[in-house]
Amino acid sequence: MREKSAGELHELAADIETELSKLRRLEQDVLLVHGEITRDPSRAHIFYENLALKLHNFYTGCERILRMVATELNGALPTGFDWHRRLLERFSVEREGRPALLSTTTAQHLQEYLAFRHIVRNLYGFELDSARLERLVDNYPSVSSAFDTDVRSFVGWMRRLAAQLENAETSSDS
């Protein structure tokens, strides 16, 4: 883990919390659109592309947080053709003086959203598999909640580390 000051850790924690709040807003939007599909199944095809984009955005937001931590604390993103998958895997294990950011279970569930994001980027909306989309939407609240819980725990660790650094600075100044 790269050495960081207490202030830098607090700033990173604040940036992560900002992203988490955006993900919570997205959750409301996913539920709203899914409600439209449930309310009027005959128009479901109209809403599936919108829902797919929202699930794409969900994983992108999760990955944005992982990228912040990778660049700020780990020092760099993984490289190579499979860097997205490796980034996710790296954060499900303790590494270089930092705890795991994600539980193994959360990381496994996020793999499905990573794979789906790839599909959304490479297919036409009308080619989407509605059954897969429904399964991801059904799992979304629990996966989103688990991600939020895991990340908040990690942010708590960063804030405790920042407090220790501040106490050490105060002690050395005395």
Enumerate the predicted regions with their spans:
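Solvent-exposed interaction patches of small proteins and small membrane subunits
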Residues: 1-174
